[in-house]
Amino acid sequence: MSDAQVAKTDVVLVGAGIMSATLSALIKLLEPNWSITLIERLDGAAAESSDPWNNAGTGHSALCELNYTPEGPGGSIDITKAVHVNEQFQVSRQFWTYAVENGVLPDVRNFINPIPHVSFVSGARNVEYLRARYDALVPNPLFATMEYIDDRDEFARRLPFMADKRDFREPVALNWSQDGTDIDFGSLSRQLIGYTAQRGMTTLFGHEVRDLDKQSDGSWSVKVVNRRTGAKRKLNAKFVFVGAGGGALPLLQKAGIEEAKGFGGFPVGGQWLRTGNPELTARHQAKVYGMPPLGAPPMSVPHLDTRVINGKSWLLFGPFAGWSPKFLKQGKVTDLPFSVKPNNLASMLGVGLTEMGLLKYLIGQLLLSEADRVETLRNFAPSARDSDWELDIAGQRVQVIRRKGKGGVLEFGTTVLAAKDGSIAGLLGASPGASTAVPAMLDVMERCFGDRYTAWLPKLKEIVPSLGTKLSDEPKLFQEIWAHGTKVLKLDHPAAGLPVAGTDTEHREPATTVTA
C-alpha cells in the first residue's frame, strides 16, 4: 500500500497484549460486522508484558496479596481494596467461562490451571496481623473458603519445600485459598486474537504506530511503519484503543488528547529467580506471597510461585527490581526522557522529590548480587541452593505518575484514559493489570460507546451474568456463577499432589493427599 492510500477501519487496536486481545473479542462478539485492525510492533502476539515470563501470572484476585489488606489503627484490617480487586477478577473469570463455552477459547488448560493462593508471614506480630486479616476476610462470600493455618506440621504438609530446614521456633502462619489459579496471559491473548483474526480482524505484526492525528470528522489518522521494510501506510479509524503497555503513554501524548496531559510514567524493570528442577516443583505447588520489606513499594511484595508455562511446571521467586529508562522490554533508552513534556514536567519532578523510599528501594535492589537474591529466597525456603536457580529478566512496568496540586504522585494500579468524545482510549499502569482486563475493557466500552453500550447490555449480561452486581452482596448468585465457572474452566480437580483442603485447619488433623 502506498503512502497516498488510506485504508479505512472501524477500530484500531495498538498492541497485541491481553488488553487489546480482550477488547477485540468483546467487540467481535457484540458487533461482528465491525472492521478491526490490530497493530503490533513485535513479530508475535503477547510478547511483552502479557508473556508468561514477563509477568507474575497470579490471576490477581486479592486472595493472597497482603498489600490489598492494609492494617489500620488499633489493628483493624481494611479489606476494601481486596474485595474490589476480587470483584474485578470475578468479571474476567465469567468472560473466560463464556468464551470457553462458546468456542472463543479452544484450549482451556493451556491458559488457566488450579493452584492455591497463599499468604505467608513469620514472627509473632505478623502472625497476629494474618489472623486478623483472615477474620476480616472470611465472612465475605468471595473469601469464605480461606483457611488460617499456624500449625507447623500442617505447614510442612502443605509447603514441604518451604518447611525444609526452617526454624519453627519463630511462629509462622498462612492464609490458604485453595481456589486460586495460575494464568498464562500470553496463551490467553493468543487464543483471543486467533478467534478475532479468524473472523476478519486484520493483524499487522512487525508494524509500529508512529503518529496519531485527529481529523475534522472526529476520526483518527494512524501513521504506521513496517519495521522490517520501512514501508509506510496510513489508516483511518473511527475508534483507537492504545493497549501498548509501557508504550501507551507516548502514543497518547502524540494524540494530544487533553485527558493525557499531566500524566507521566516511571519505568521499573523486573527480575526473577527461576527453577525447573522437578524435585523442587513437586514439593512446592502454590503461589505464596509474603510481606513487603519495610518502606518498600507495593510492587515489591515477594512471592514464590508455581507457574505452568507450555505445559511445564516452574518455580519463580521475586520480583527483584531492575531499572532501565525503557518503557518496554524491547523499547528504547529514550522512552523516559522523551516522555517528559511541559504539561507533565511538574508531575515528574514532584515524584522525583517525594518518592525517596522508592529511590532507596531501587538502589538497594540494583546492588544485589545473585547470591544476595538467593539469600532473600531463603526467607521463604531456607533449603534453597544457589545452583538450582537462575536469574531471568522479566518485563518492564511503567507506574503511573498523576498530577496532584503543583506536583505529582506515583500510583500503583491501572488507569483508563479516554477522550471526552470517546474516539480514543488507552490503558496506563501495571498491577493488578492483566487479571482485570475484562472489567477494564468494559469500562473503555461504556465510556467510549455510551450510545451503543445500552444496546449491548443484554448480550453483555449473557457474557458476564453478574454485570452491574457486587457478588460480595449476593452470596447465592456468587455460588451459582462460581460453581459453573469452575466446571467449565476445569478447575474442579486439583493438580497432582496437591493436598485436600477443608474450611479451617487451625485445629484439624492433617488431611490426606490427592494424587489424581
From Swiss-Prot:
InterPro entries: FAD/NAD-bd_sf (IPR036188), MQO (IPR006231). GO terms for biological process: tricarboxylic acid cycle. It comes from the Bacteria. Keywords: FAD, Flavoprotein, Oxidoreductase, Tricarboxylic acid cycle. One of its GO terms (molecular function) is L-malate dehydrogenase (quinone) activity. Its EC number is 1.1.5.4. Pathway: Carbohydrate metabolism; tricarboxylic acid cycle; oxaloacetate from (S)-malate (quinone route): step 1/1. Its cofactor is FAD. The keyword Transport does not apply. It catalyses: (S)-malate + a quinone = a quinol + oxaloacetate. Belongs to the MQO family. PANTHER family: L-2-HYDROXYGLUTARATE DEHYDROGENASE, MITOCHONDRIAL (PTHR43104:SF2). This is Probable malate:quinone oxidoreductase. It comes from Mycobacterium sp. (strain KMS). The lineage of its organism: Bacteria, Bacillati, Actinomycetota, Actinomycetes, Mycobacteriales. The gene is mqo.
